[in-house]
Amino acid sequence: MVLTPVSPVVLVILDGWGYREELVGNAIAAAHTPVMDSLWQAYPHTLVYTSGKAVGLPKGQMGNSEVGHLNLGAGRIVPQELVRISDAAEDGSLAANPALVQVYEGVKQRGTKLHLVGLCSDGGVHSHLDHLLALLDMAKSLGVTQVCVHAITDGRDTLPTEGKTFIQRLQDHLDRLEMGQIVTLSGRYYAMDRDRRWDRVERAYRVMTSDENIVDTPAWKILANGYAENITDEFLPPVRIAPGAIAAGDGVVFFNFRPDRARQLTQAFVDPNFKGFERSLISPLDFVTFTQYDASLSCAIAFPPQNLSNILGEVIAAKGLKQLRVAETEKYAHVTYFFNGGIEDPLPGEDRILVPSPMVATYDQAPAMSAAQVTQEVIAAVEKGVYSMVVVNYANPDMVGHTGQMKATIQALEAVDRCVGQLLQSVLQMGGTLLITADHGNAECMVDEQGNPWTAHTTNPVPFILVEGEGVKIPGHGTDVALRDDGCLADIAPTILEILRLPQPAEMTGRSLIQPLEVDLRPNRTPVRVRL
């Protein structure tokens, strides 16, 4: 019979809570966070890397929530889709991709239009401009002449007004190829909603599927006009600037590689049972997505999912132990789908709690978001005493940090700090262990070198704090522990397994962050009282 460990391990992911020593523009340094400050002083802590090759991204590439949670749950460095697709573009195999070739040849034979849809930036979080340029090169080489680009502008994973640079680079490439045109523009606020705010998605969809209300203005000028009215890239209202509506018989390639913000717009095009808003299904329509956005969607996939076996959740489930995932809407997919390596359905013994995010235009209007409700759900679950592992995400540092609003971000951080304090008391009373970390940086850098708002992620490391409960929580140590200072997110799953006394599978190549000190064994510390 498998015995459930006496007390839980609770992994707290402070989304976007990075570490940076510089004080200028550092919302975390400016915020009053007595709980996190006390824990950092009182308990074993270290910094872990969350960007670049440490998480399977190109060198110097900032991390993101999808990548972070994927590495956290997999317990290994997972080669990311950005690298996978970029390699295909560089070595020429992209042009031979069966799913892409089929849609390209199809529109060529039918004499219909090819539509390239996606986020037009080099942010590398949801897409990369180089991938779009490679798709255009492929169209040129295959003799596809009717090419319509539906450019989604960023301003969130890039600077707020950097879109003009990306659009100009795209237009220059089209001019060199003497083929294709930009036909629509839409800020990601509309085209890439992930919180079922269908009114936003509908505005992008209507513009993409209708040749009415054409604004005869170059794309760069549309953006410049928006900047003059304080409308940044993210919030650019959808607009059609040239003919080329998506119609029956056409082919579509959605070149975003991250699923969560591409899913809803894709559903509007391909789901025969779509209920988000009134529309007639465009059929037939050859629709290809770069990666699998949702297993239930009937569309071709250029880069099918990679198989990850023996991830952390599977190891827990295989031992007959119960686990829980809790997050509000904005990060729910991350603690479930991404943390489970792309598995949509819950694992055996895995429970999930979704707390609705507040329905506001931008989260600086509600910086506390739903953190208090998330905390209460976790406390209630921990006190049941049935879960061996609990994974909880606090979205505030990232989601409010993305607004670029310093005051609101400070308020968000302080709200999360209070919640961590409340959760801490509950976990320690149960004799549990609290592991506090983040998936990437954001809130620690709110301005760029010129003092302008910085709304993107960072390449900074993030904190990792190990908070012990009343009992002997680190098996085999019975004393203070030291933590390695060269770790990455992939090392956290092995750390959890060590605490739970579970063997680490061979596929999990990360290394536990725990290393015992060379001292005589003594009883565990009395937990330090945290200033609340």
From Swiss-Prot:
The organism is Cyanothece sp. (strain PCC 7425 / ATCC 29141)
Q: Which GO terms describe its molecular function?
A: manganese ion binding; phosphoglycerate mutase activity
Record-linked NCBIfam families: pgm_bpd_ind (TIGR01307)
Cite the binding residues for substrate. Answer: 126, 156-157, 188, 194, 258-261, 331
Residues engaged in binding Mn(2+) 2: 15, 65, 439-440
User: Known Gene3D superfamilies for this protein?
Assistant: Alkaline Phosphatase, subunit A, BPG-independent phosphoglycerate mutase, domain B
Could you say which cofactors this protein requires?
Mn(2+)
Q: In which pathway does it act?
A: Carbohydrate degradation; glycolysis; pyruvate from D-glyceraldehyde 3-phosphate: step 3/5
**Role this protein plays:** Catalyzes the interconversion of 2-phosphoglycerate and 3-phosphoglycerate.
Pfam annotation, one family? Metalloenzyme
* Designated name of the protein: 2,3-bisphosphoglycerate-independent phosphoglycerate mutase
Q: Which InterPro entries does the protein's record reference? A: Alkaline_phosphatase_core_sf, BPG-indep_PGM_N, Metalloenzyme, PGAM_B_sf, Pgm_bpd_ind
Q: Which reaction does it catalyse?
A: (2R)-2-phosphoglycerate = (2R)-3-phosphoglycerate
**Protein family:** Belongs to the BPG-independent phosphoglycerate mutase family.
